[in-house]
Structure formats: C-alpha cells, structure tokens
C-alpha cells in the first residue's frame, strides 16, 4: 500500500545567482503587534502619531524609499514615470487621450520629447495599487484641513514634520499630474493611474507589480468638474499650511489651485465619466460639492469675491445634515469652511471672511429674507443627528454607524466636523459635540464590546489582518497566517450595526483600509488632542519599532524560503518527494536573479542518474506571466567534498520578487529501479 509522509514547513535560505549557498534552516522571528505595553486607555497623542503612518505604507513611485518611514516599503511602480504617450490599445498600455490631442499638445505633455509622460508619485488607494482620483483628492484635502485646523496638536506631539512629508507627497503628485501651457492654462489633468479590473486579481507587494497601468486624463473636451475642483481644493489648503514656513512652495501650490479652478470655471460643468477609469470602484454622483469646496478655500485665501459668486448657484445649504463628509459628499466640510468665512473676522491673520455671505446667497438663490439660515447651525444640526440616530444607526454599544462600507470612516469624519464646530463656536473648548466625538474615538480605540482597537498596531487587542497586500506579504488574501508586517495606524472598515466585526485579511468590508478611511481619522485625533490632550498622553518613543529580518545569516541578502515536503514512497524502495516552496524576503529592492536549491543525498542509491525532477505548479507563471520558474538538475554539488551530495535548482530569471512570495511545487526522486530515502535530504 502506498503511504505518504510529511515533512513540516522549513525555512531555507534562497540563493541569488551571484552567491551560492547551502540550504539550512533558520528560526522564525515573530512580529509584535504593539510597540509598547498594551493599553486600553484613549491616548490621543499616540493615536495621532500612529494614524499618519498608514500613508507611509501606501506611497507610490520613484521616491518612496526617500520618504517612507517603514523599512518594508520601497520604490514601486517606477514605470509610472514612463507612461507611453499614446492612446491605449487592447493591452491597456498608454492613456485615454486621442492621437489628435496628443499631437496638438505634445509640447505640453512631453516637453523633453522622449515619448513618455511622468505620472509617478502619489498614493495607492487601499490594499490595492490603483491611484484613483476621487479618494486621492479627498484624502489630500482632508489631511490638509485637519492640519490647518489643529496644527498645534501636530507640533506639540512632534508629528508636524511627518504630516508635512505626507502632504507634500500628495500635492506634489497633484501638481505633476497637471499640465499647463505657457499661459498657465490647464491643458490636461491626470486623475487616475492604473485600472481596478487589471490590478485587483493580484495579491503581491507593490514593489514587484508589472501589470499594465493606463493613465486617465481630463481635458477641455471632457472636463470632469469634480476631479479638477477636488484637486484645486487640496492645493489651496496646501498653500495655507506652508505659506509661513515655505512661501515659494505655498505660492506654487496656490498657482496650481487657481489654474485648476479656472479650468473648472471656464469649461462646461460636467460630472466625471465613471466608466472612464474608476468604473464601479468609485462612482461619483455630483460635482457641485467639490466645486464649492475649492471655491470656499480660494476665497478664504484671496478674498476675491468671484469665488463666492461661483458658490452661490451651486451651494446646497440643506445638504450637510443629510449625510456625512466623505469623498462623494463634501457638503459637511463645505459648510464648516463657509461657517468660518461667515464670521465677523478671521481667526487667523491674513485670511478673509465675508459676514454677508448668507444674505448674498439668499438674494442669489431667491430665498425668503426671513428664512433662518446659518452655516454653523446647519453643521450643529448634522452633529445632533449623528449623536441621536437621526441619521444612520446607533449600535447597542452607542457607536454611530452609517454604512456597511467603512463605518469607521464615516464615524471619524463626523468626529472631525464636531471638533471643528467646537473650535469656532465654543472658544476651542469641548462641548457636548466634542464629548460625543471623544466617546466615539474611545470606542474605536478599544472601549467596545469586543475590546478591540480598530487601529492596527495600537495595542495588543488591535485588528491584525487588514486587507492590504504590502503588509500581508502573503500570496493570497485568503491566507489566515500572521501578516508579515504591522500596518501601524491603519483604520480598518470597522464594526457593523450590531457591534460585530470579523478580523480576516480577505474581508474587504470589515477590514478594508484606504487613504480616504484614514484621512478624517488623522484630523479627528488631532482635534481630540487639542480638546483633551494632557501630559498623560505621550507618543510612542523610537517608533516604528525596527523589524527583525527573518532571513538566516549567510542567506541571500534577506531572501529565504519556506518549504514543505511530502514523501511519496513507491513499491520496491523507489519514491519521490513533493516539495512546496515559497520564496520570501524582507528586501524592498526587487531582484531578478533568484535561485533556490534543494539538496539531497544519493548515498543509498546505486545509480543517481535515475533521479528525475519535474515541475508541478508555479504560482508566478500563473499570476505574473511571462514569469516562469525553471527547474533543472539533478547536479552533483562537490565531489571532493562528498560525492553523494546532489541538488536540484529552481530559478526565476527576470522575475522580480520583493516583499512577497509565490508558491512553487516540484517533484524529485525515483519512480523505479533504485532506492529513494528522503530522510537524509535538506
């Protein structure tokens, strides 16, 4: 009767072709999920510190290594810097621009004439690697808004430099994606790089991606007002955040903001074509909120009345209490900024207010002069709905729940609005609005029925399986093993309406993480520290903790192999060993010369030439064609050392492996005519 015998998973070093090494076992080093002692108390300094780090994990482009604070992230999608300036074909390589448009504006789009357009930079949307325009713009402006409103919190906790790095990375990308002619007129703006349908089937580190990443542009023929206005808003806020510390950079941001808004003013007001790029992933439903969001910031900066005149025809005074501030509904934020503009005088010197805003709006919109209207009253109405269940649902444990997708995202956005309200309406002191926000944040940090923090790495009871390829380091999201890296500061989707939550990597509802989910969370942490911060709230020192390499000394530059062997004996003493291996690494630098060797002894054999090796499965070839592992051998190792030692070799010439792993399965052994003893193999 045929029997099988299993060898447990082993760790072996993986050889680079530049250095041969023996395969030996090495210990597994476990990642800790917390950088300090577990705590269930709400520490808003620590929460603010951690919250910014999520963006280090989602940086994209040729400058990731210079800017990220995570050792496990490196430059990725560097080919975004050389997108072929051509209409995309069936291979999805190129742009959505027509050849005639490219020919007409080649000097603007490709000033160096190399045939490419540079769109590197920015941030991956979520655990995937597409750069979607709406969440990119929203996250950029919302992070900037939080810094603008609660700058002291960042400075007191030592986080100003970090948030400024993130804000520059966002806004530098938005400027790079905006193509101006010699008159500073916007000719084109790239609002998306990558395609969700192409990107989403993969589950690997961004550093090794090689899939097609088409670029999507808006132009005067297809203006897509929501995209261009949302980008203008972020750049306008960026001006306010840097005008006192880097005035030249601030002016550059403002110039781009004005140019983008002028494009939106001049061209037909048009909702984005959701089929051209975002498809079903981010379906924008209106442009008016983004347009007013940008115009409000530009008035606040310039005092130019034309920006208020642009708001009046499209302003929806009644919208804010009907939903929560988010990428597809900016009205809650718009109402806050218009509330600031409606003040008698600005809170900060050099900015502008217009106390007659509501009066002029009523006249413009043919409203009754007797109708009670007040921007801040509208904001307070929204907050009271969040608090009492007038909008959404209050869970049994008191959590404000709005939507299945990203409940924590909406909850923290509502918190941010409540905290901004108290800043301007309660002399910067907490009222019932801030108290409500504080209780909601305490819930998310661990004061909930599950005693679970919905912020990755915050304490020992934090969620541990965010839906994120780079932190996962595994071959598929269904893998339930511990993730390779801790995605510190990421706010996951959150609980459902019954306070339940499932902590699984594959669950992209409960455990989704995105740049828009974290954006208001960062600002809310800063606002809560402004309201409640004291000396008991301290940041984590020496953060993030240094990760230990899992590769064994003498290994291939932080490359190693996890392997599992199953023996399959045949009658008469013959048999084979089925080897399943995964190449793994802590390196963020892709290598294309990976080789793995499996050594075995032929001491029991009469004729080693009968040994055969053959491939059973190559995940790289299946998922990343034309990548293809090649198995060869057997080869004698060194007859002078031991004539009985042989090895088989698997190599992936030309395939990049970094911060990820792919399964490879092969057989080695004898089917007849000799004795196979796997007990002395390694």
Where are these regions (language model features)?
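Short beta-strand elements of extracellular/lumenal beta-sandwich folds
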Residues: 563-592, 598-601
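Aromatic-lined, polymer-binding surfaces characteristic
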Residues: 228, 232-242, 250-254, 260-299, ...
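A surface/secretory-pathway sequence property marking extracellular, secreted
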Residues: 603-653
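Terminal connector regions
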Residues: 657, 663-682
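Bacterial N-terminal signal peptides that target proteins for export
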Residues: 3-17, 28
């Amino acid at each position: 009767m045929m029997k099988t015998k299993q060898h447990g998973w082993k760790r072996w070093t993986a050889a680079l072709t530049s250095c041969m090494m023996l395969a030996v076992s090495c210990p597994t080093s476990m990642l800790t999920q917390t950088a300090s002692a577990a705590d269930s108390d709400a520490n808003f300094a620590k929460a603010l510190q951690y919250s910014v780090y999520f963006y280090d994990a989602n940086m994209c482009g040729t400058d990731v290594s210079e800017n990220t604070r995570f050792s496990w992230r490196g430059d990725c999608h560097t080919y975004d810097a050389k997108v072929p300036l051509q209409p995309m074909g069936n291979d999805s390589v190129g742009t959505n621009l027509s050849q005639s448009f490219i020919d007409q504006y080649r000097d603007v789009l490709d000033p160096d004439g190399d045939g490419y357009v540079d769109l590197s930079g920015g941030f991956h949307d979520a655990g995937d690697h597409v750069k979607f325009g709406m969440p990119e713009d929203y996250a950029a402006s919302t992070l900037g808004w939080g810094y603008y409103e609660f700058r002291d919190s960042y400075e007191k906790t030592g986080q100003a430099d970090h948030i400024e790095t993130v804000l520059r990375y966002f806004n530098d990308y938005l400027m790079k994606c905006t193509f101006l002619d010699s008159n500073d007129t916007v000719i084109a703006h790239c609002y998306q790089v990558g395609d969700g349908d192409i990107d989403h089937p993969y589950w690997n580190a961004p550093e090794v991606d090689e899939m097609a990443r088409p670029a999507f542009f808006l132009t005067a023929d297809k203006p897509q007002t929501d995209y261009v206005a949302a980008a203008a808003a972020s750049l306008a806020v960026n001006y306010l955040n840097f005008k006192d510390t880097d005035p030249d950079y601030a002016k550059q941001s403002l110039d781009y903001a004005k140019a983008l808004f002028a494009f939106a003013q001049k061209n037909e007001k048009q909702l984005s074509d959701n089929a051209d790029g975002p498809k079903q992933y981010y379906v924008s439903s209106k442009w008016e909120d983004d347009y007013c969001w940008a115009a409000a910031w530009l008035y606040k900066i310039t005092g130019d009345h034309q920006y208020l005149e642009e708001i009046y025809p499209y302003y929806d005074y009644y919208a804010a209490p009907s939903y929560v501030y988010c990428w597809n509904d900016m009205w809650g934020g718009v109402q806050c900024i218009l509330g600031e503009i409606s003040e008698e005088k600005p809170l900060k010197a050099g900015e502008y207010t217009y106390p007659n805003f509501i009066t002029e709006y009523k006249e413009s919109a043919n409203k009754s002069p007797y109708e009670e209207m007040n921007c801040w009253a509208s904001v307070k109405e929204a907050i009271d709905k969040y608090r009492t269940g007038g909008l959404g649902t209050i869970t049994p444990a008191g959590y404000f729940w709005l939507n299945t997708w990203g409940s924590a995202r909406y909850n923290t956005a509502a918190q941010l609005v409540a905290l901004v309200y108290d800043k301007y309406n309660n002399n910067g002191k907490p009222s019932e609005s801030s108290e409500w926000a504080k209780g909601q944040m305490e819930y998310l940090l661990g004061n909930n029925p599950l005693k679970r923090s919905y912020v990755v790495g915050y304490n020992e009871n934090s969620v541990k399986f965010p839906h994120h390829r780079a932190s996962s380091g595994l071959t598929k999201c269904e893998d339930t093993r511990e993730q390779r890296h801790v995605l510190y500061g990421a706010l996951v989707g959150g609980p459902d309406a019954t306070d339940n939550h499932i902590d699984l990597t594959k669950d992209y509802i409960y455990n989704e993480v995105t740049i828009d989910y974290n954006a208001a969370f960062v600002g809310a942490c800063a606002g809560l520290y402004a309201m409640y911060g004291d000396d008991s709230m301290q940041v984590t020192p020496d953060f993030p903790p240094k990760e230990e390499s899992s590769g064994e000394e003498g290994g291939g530059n932080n490359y190693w192999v996890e392997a599992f062997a199953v023996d399959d004996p045949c009658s008469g003493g013959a048999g084979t060993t089925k080897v399943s291996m995964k190449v793994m690494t802590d390196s963020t630098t892709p290598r294309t010369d990976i080789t793995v060797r499996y050594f075995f002894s032929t001491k029991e054999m009469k004729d080693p030439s009968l040994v055969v090796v053959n491939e059973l499965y190559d995940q790289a070839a299946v998922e990343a064609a034309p990548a293809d592992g090649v198995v060869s051998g057997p080869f004698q190792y060194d007859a002078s050392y031991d004539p009985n030692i042989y090895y088989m070799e698997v190599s992936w010439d030309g395939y990049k492996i970094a911060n990820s792993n792919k399964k490879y399965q092969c057989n080695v052994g004898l089917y007849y005519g000799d004795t196979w003893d796997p007990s002395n193999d390694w």
